[in-house]
Amino acid sequence: MTLFERSAKELQAEIKAGNLSIADLTKEAYERIAKLDGDVQAFLASNEEKATAQAAEMDKVPFEERGPLFGLPIGVKDNIVTEGLETTCASKILEGFMPIYDATVVNKLREAGMITVGKLNMDEFAMGSSNENSYYKTTKNPWNLNHVPGGSSGASAASVAAGEVPFSLGSDTGGSIRQPAAYCGVVGMKPTYGRVSRFGLVAFASSLDQIGPITRNVEDNALLLEAIAGLDPNDSTSADVEVPNYAAALTGDVKGLRIAVPKEFLGEGVGEAARQSVLAALEVLKGLGATVEEVSLPHSKYALAAYYILSSSEASSNLSRFDGIRYGFRAENVTNLMDLYKETRAQGFGDEVKRRIMLGTYSLSAGTYDAYYKKAQQARTLIKADYDKVFEDFDVIIGPTSPTPAFKIGENVDDPMTMYANDILTIPMNLAGVPAISIPCGFDNGLPLGLQIIGKYFDEATIYRVAHAFEQATEFHKQVPQMWEGK
């Protein structure tokens, strides 16, 4: 087994007792990566030399100056810029790009004393649900290497599930933290839009993107979100809302809490195993004193279409900056500027990215703007109103994270519509801007299933409270992939 089986609190206790050093933890991360990443394929870039030197220095820091995450290793998704460490967004067009500054969240990790061990694979520019859209490699699911880890933060979830690192950061535009967390049997939180700074996150869809933590348990997740959250003057969309002590919310008490279960989340298209695991989870929470009632979110049926119009429209604008002029890949053997733009983008972007750029450009064009983009914005307003109405009477909403467990690698690669439908249960929360978490709640043929808990704006604390209570009443979070054994 690995040191990373333990929680942050347990690791800090071992360090304080003198049984473990920060250098030991960093060494463990790189040894695990060396042993397992040939199979998992999670990491794109390593920070070993700097991280090892940093760990040796951090062991000298007095205990009274250390926080709960001090000295612990973390992997960072490759669309979050890291000064001096290659950031590619898993795209050919950014191959070799070396950022000259750190994202705000990376600065916050450093302030918390965490050690960035490397950059994690993803679907190119965060567009995908399987990690198969990466230009560099396809990350595998640690529970079954023939299956996908989810996307787009698939490697962020897989690296934690495999025990390569105990923490990672991902980004979530339509489910890209929660769906991989469900597929890999770990805990993934999409915070409220604006809770975490997006400064230094390479933009896909600016009104939807949000950075969040992936961990093995709820308490560690709460600690990491507290470390990265908060107002940032460099991000005009970050919210000036106080960041609470999330760990203090983990009381285990959910008596009197009101839980809404949308009938749309357990209806047609949701697999029987996913449905039954959610119903069983609701029984656990009822047994702990919560009340459960069925509700309706009637406009959820428009979410998938609205999301792909809006996100693709924003992507077509955001990705126009990648043209081969100032950084990244540049096409060769071109004779004029227009050909340079065309060839650089044609060769540098993958098929899925080009598909979404075209979809977005079409949606924003003069003849179709009202019929597509404007209508999608109206649908988004209705979806948000549905959530506002439910949250007048309920504390959280619960349903499955994904309709099914992880599918096989290659199974949906030529079927974009089926691939898009994998996010049908996570997309509405991004459109509404509300926070949501995925935690392990069961298995289907040896593959994990996720329970999604959705909360009110900026009320991640209540989500953590419910998630922690369920976690403590069950054993799902303690189960690990077979590859942990003897490694």
Swiss-Prot record:
What does the record give under GO molecular function? ATP binding; glutaminyl-tRNA synthase (glutamine-hydrolyzing) activity
Which InterPro entries does this one have? Answer: Amidase, Amidase_dom, AS_sf, GatA
User: Quick one: a GO biological-process term for this protein?
Assistant: translation
The EC code for this enzyme is: 6.3.5.7
**Catalytic residues as annotated in Swiss-Prot or TrEMBL:** 77, 152, 176
Which protein family is it in? Answer: Belongs to the amidase family. GatA subfamily.
Assembly: Heterotrimer of A, B and C subunits.
Protein name, as recorded:
Glutamyl-tRNA(Gln) amidotransferase subunit A
Query: What is the organism of origin for this protein?
Result: Lysinibacillus sphaericus (strain C3-41)
